[in-house]
Amino acid sequence: MLEALDLAGVRGERRLFDHLTFRIVPGECLSVHGENGSGKTTLLRTLAGFATPAAGRVLWKGKPLRNQWSEYQRELVYNGHGIGLKEDLNALDNLLAAAAIAGEPVTTECVESALDEVGLAEHRHLPFRMLSQGQKRRASLARLLLYRRKLWILDEPSTALDQFGARWLGELIHRHQSRGGMVVLTSHQELALKTSQTVRMGA
């Protein structure tokens, strides 16, 4: 269970959000909406433990993040605005390297299977810089298939995806929820999601 208790977030001297409280339990998806600059990314980074709230607390399984940082990171996948993969490596080697850094024991066969699901099997040996932005985004999202993590925090995961890719992403999130996973996301693109809760920033 992920809880936000009376959270406040700032950027510089500007307060982006205040007194934000919610709770997400297994099987739920929290969708965060708001205009650009309303604090969506700040909120997601705070929930991931990468930013310190101006006030309030984030709890995981009833305990503050600071008391269980390493354990929390092993149960979390954070997919931010950036792709987070190296331009000079191919998709296969990128995902193998990323999994090793994340401490996930995956085989080449597992990575190839994930690339096949995201439609990149034929491009797995191409240098990453030669892929389109949509293909790069799909390669980045393939990590969700490889990492067995309970909580997904996804910042605009549908960016650069076409209609097919967005539909696949919605189905993937639904599968994760059906297995007891939790999701927090922002998206400008309409996704077919079983959303349990909505937070509107700047309202």
Curated annotation (Swiss-Prot):
Its main location: membrane. GO terms for cellular component: plasma membrane. Keywords: ATP-binding, Cell inner membrane, Cell membrane, Cytochrome c-type biogenesis, Membrane, Nucleotide-binding, Translocase, Transport. Its EC number is 7.6.2.5. Pfam families: ABC_tran. The keyword Transmembrane does not apply. The keyword Cytoplasm does not apply. InterPro entries: AAA+_ATPase, ABC_transporter-like_ATP-bd, ABC_transporter-like_CS, ABC_transptr_haem_export_CcmA, P-loop_NTPase. It is found in: Cell inner membrane. Residues 2-203 form the ABC transporter domain. It comes from the Bacteria. ATP binds at residues 34-41. One of its GO terms (molecular function) is ATP hydrolysis activity. It is a peripheral membrane protein. Belongs to the ABC transporter superfamily. CcmA exporter (TC 3.A.1.107) family. NCBIfam families: ccmA (TIGR01189), PRK13538.1 (NF010061). The complex is composed of two ATP-binding proteins (CcmA) and two transmembrane proteins (CcmB). Part of the ABC transporter complex CcmAB involved in the biogenesis of c-type cytochromes; once thought to export heme, this seems not to be the case, but its exact role is uncertain. Responsible for energy coupling to the transport system. This is Cytochrome c biogenesis ATP-binding export protein CcmA. It comes from Pseudomonas aeruginosa. The gene is ccmA.
